[in-house]
Amino acid sequence: MMKSNASPSESLSHHTPMMQQYLRLKAENPDILLFYRMGDFYELFYDDAKRASELLDISLTKRGASAGEPIPMAGVPFHAVEGYLAKLVQMGESVAICEQIGDPATSKGPVERKVVRIVTPGTVTDEALLSERVDNLIAAIYHHNGRFGYATMDITSGRFQLSEPQTEEEMAAELQRTSPRELLFPEDFSPVHLMASRQGNRRRPIWEFELDTAKQQLNQQFGTRDLVGFGVEQAKLGLCAAGCLIQYVKDTQRTALPHIRSLTWDRQDQSVILDAATRRNLELTHNLAGGTDNTLAEVLDHCATPMGSRMLKRWIHQPMRDNATLNQRLDAITELKETALYGELHPVLKQIGDIERILARLALRSARPRDLARLRHAMQQLPELHSVMSELKQPHLTELRTHAEPMDELCDLLERAIKENPPVVIRDGGVIADGYSAELDEWRDLANGATEFLERLEAEERDRHGIDTLKVGYNNVHGFYIQVSRGQSHLVPPHYVRRQTLKNAERYIIEELKQHEDKVLNSKSRALALEKQLWEELFDLLMPHLEQLQQLAASVAQLDVLQNLAERAENLEYCRPTLVQEAGIHIQGGRHPVVERVMNEPFIANPIELNPQRRMLIITGPNMGGKSTYMRQTALIALMAHIGSYVPAESASIGPLDRIFTRIGASDDLASGRSTFMVEMTETANILHNATRNSLVLMDEIGRGTSTYDGLSLAWASAEWLAKEIGAMTLFATHYFELTELPNVLPHLANVHLDAVEHGDGIAFMHAVQEGAASKSYGLAVAGLAGVPKPVIKNARAKLQQLELLSSQPAETRKPSRVDIANQLSLIPEPSAVEQALAGVDPDQLTPRQALDMLYQLKKLL
């Protein structure tokens, strides 16, 4: 915006009336772009124009002068505005849309204008601005005494949730899970690093996060006296965030939010917790490069509807612990799979489409004619859907069927009210169906020229005056007229008033035709005004059905997810997992759900056995041998079981899980100034602090980012801590062969390896998991595969032989001048002299004197 040191009244007085109006509206929306409607364009001025010019790559011009200065200006055509808005929203920008609401014909001075909507990344509902199969969330974050309050809303579905992460790690995981398009935070928010590199961050006044203000806002939204009924009364920090969020959404939408009906507490103890690193490493919905190819969601998501696809992704990102709900889902999938009804459901559901987002636009009264046409089409599918579902017996599926009952009254209303193929917008009419309103039909007939009246008038005038060439016509210049050929013009009566002379004819007007013309011209505007009124009344008629429609959308989305998982289970040969109460993971013939889909050759299935007596597997084997794939597939199978899906295995028995941790791969975090090793150690520290006996931990190549001794020491100590202090179910892949000694000194550990076979200078990876430690690492063979020059490989092989020879010699025979590279640090503690002395003593055979002597001997050995 233009900057000035003068007071607002002083500075405005120097501007033209139109710019005064603009500056007043801009002052009400100082932090966002203002699209100011002028005729067929939306214009931006001053700093907004400069910013829009850069972001949208549009021309920056100047508009005359105001207050003695040229005004920077940029604009976009009104008919193309949605494309520009989509681009800005993708960049995290917010835009206020200012429309002309006054009549230019009657306005004295500038036409009255008003901001009619504010488009923000987290509150958009227009189809053109949304990703069809991804949730579009807005969130608010609050921080107090090291703890957080967090609230999210999906305005396109009405879901409104809060949570209270206890640590920065938990908060970071929540931000990654929910990926809000817009994030509100208080002005005094201190852990700003949590929001680094995020688009759409919005600073809000501190008072908007006050608890009393928040409760007042929420009670006002829900029409309640308190929040006890929602079970969120004790979540004070979460409520602070939720209050700010609901106020912001109301302010931007400029209307009521009738579809936001409840607030739920998203408790961590109900979910299998995945931290940010785990979501990234397991490539659930995004791969490591940031795309969506080759992810778990890509493999599992063949949903018929966008709302089903979005629900499936929510399930994937929030696996649950409640076995009753999971078995309910599995029972439903089993019936759909065994009856093959998924094949009949899919095409019907596809016809229903994305009614969830249509309902949000309906609630906000921003639905367009084609939204209601699509809603009508969805309603028309319900009888067939209900018929297909009538064959289902499983209780959860029959419950879903009750929420998908045909809505005949609503369907009939939409069939009567909306034309078969309505235009995109109501602006020019043509939306309300013929026959819905007798008054509208009458005005439309007039607007279309009322051909019956004209035909009758033409016949009467022709017969009355005996003029057989007489006919009634219309053109845009002269309106309605009576045309008579020049040869019969002498028969025209005196009350005919000549309007136009042509070469071979004369055109006349009579009072009766003039009255009709006035009525017709007036009828077009009357018909359009009445149609817009009927359109608004239609919203009022639909609103009482909103809650039932939302239940329908939720049930159809869930049915879609279940039929989709049934189809995936059948076509990808998945098995039903057994969820048990005993700790452990037992998988036979497990496969990686993503890798097996992209491989050209058959995937080698592998078993895994983790139980209270076998809590940690030390995994060794060559690089590229499949260690990381084996670990990831175990985590993905466990995760899929905890969303209630069939899994890629011959059989699977999965015990209770509270968290899944992964420490797999790493790269420099340049934005935060952290090295590869620092990233690795930060993730390791998070695991060692937060893992429990019911956690599944994946540790891959710990310690490789530092020196050999440091790395080996850290890897050994981390494995020992996980085994002795935590007892978590752990897959620990390592290239430090010294760690294969751990199962010999600690209980509940075992060695497994992935083998390979060398032939000449080449190597064949077997990808099969076998018991015991690997015999060698095959590092040189892998280097050869990678294209390392043969002379380098040959030299490395010679050095390897020297090192192996060195390590086999007794230490005292080695030349002191040679660097002792091969003498690796032994991490298995040798017995001390005291321990050796005590080992040979039988306390029961010692006399008091002998015991005293032994004590003095031990003292000397210390």
Swiss-Prot record:
Lineage of the species this protein comes from: Bacteria, Pseudomonadati, Pseudomonadota, Gammaproteobacteria, Vibrionales
HAMAP family listed in its UniProt record: MutS
Functional summary from the UniProt entry: This protein is involved in the repair of mismatches in DNA. It is possible that it carries out the mismatch recognition step. This protein has a weak ATPase activity.
GO molecular function annotation: ATP binding; ATP-dependent DNA damage sensor activity; damaged DNA binding; mismatched DNA binding
The keyword DNA damage belongs to this UniProt entry's keyword annotation: yes
Name of protein: DNA mismatch repair protein MutS
Binding-site residues for ATP, renumbered to this chain: G621, P622, N623, M624, G625, G626, K627, S628
InterPro entries: DNA_mismatch_repair_MutS (IPR005748), DNA_mismatch_repair_MutS-lik_N (IPR007695), DNA_mismatch_repair_MutS/MSH (IPR017261), DNA_mismatch_repair_MutS_C (IPR000432), DNA_mismatch_repair_MutS_clamp (IPR007861), DNA_mismatch_repair_MutS_core (IPR007696), DNA_mismatch_repair_MutS_N (IPR016151), DNA_mismatch_repair_MutS_sf (IPR036187)
Keywords for this protein: ATP-binding, DNA damage, DNA repair, DNA-binding, Nucleotide-binding
Gene3D superfamilies: 1.10.1420.10, 6.10.140.430, DNA repair protein MutS, domain I (3.40.1170.10), MutS, connector domain (3.30.420.110), P-loop containing nucleotide triphosphate hydrolases (3.40.50.300)
Gene Ontology biological process terms from the UniProt entry: mismatch repair
PROSITE patterns: DNA_MISMATCH_REPAIR_2
Any matching Pfam family: MutS_I
Family that this chain belongs to: Belongs to the DNA mismatch repair MutS family.
CDD domains: ABC_MutS1
GO cellular component: cytosol
